[in-house]
Amino acid sequence: VLVRQPDTSRPASLPSGPLEPRHRTLEAGLRTWVEEQTGYDLGYVEQLYSFGDANRHASARAQPGRMLSIGYLALVHESKPRRMEASEWRSWYDFFPWEDWRDGEPEILSSVRDGIAGWIAEAPRDERKSREERSRVAFGLPGSPWNEELVLERYELLYEIGLVPEAHRDGAACWAPREAAIMDADSLQADHRRILAT
């Protein structure tokens, strides 16, 4: 995954920018922003997902209106870009270590499941069964297999519980305290990790 981090005191971000009048289409805007920010010319581009939820992150709550984010998958040639300052290639698993089953079940999954178990245990009686089912399906808890296609659902569940730092940064109402957030995974600015999960 190509990320940008011009300011090392802040989390990295995906290449991005607003649609502007100079962009004839959404794809033209995407190509312009990626080339300007990373030096790469994009090859094949496919739109994957659109996010338009109200109040998705702190900066969206501070401004009137709604922010629309569109996630793309784009391919680039392996050659060196014209410039790459503040950009680097990172493993997708840096952002989702609980998804890395290449060497068997990831160690981090036990602490994730402990956090989820606490969230379920403290649920009001009428919500407990729903939380159990959602967690069982998303995280392959006893009685359910691990489904590698549920990356977004797992991330959104961890966000809702408060087990990822972005939930606390965004001021989301969540069950887990800030100290319980999983710090063994790298976060991204705004809702970029959610977009990456698609």
What are these regions (language model features)?
Residues V1-L2, S13, S69-G71, D94:
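Ordered hydrophobic segments in well-structured contexts
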Residues V1-Y40, Y44, L48-R56:
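Conserved Nudix-box catalytic region and its N-terminal flanking loop in Nudix hydrolases
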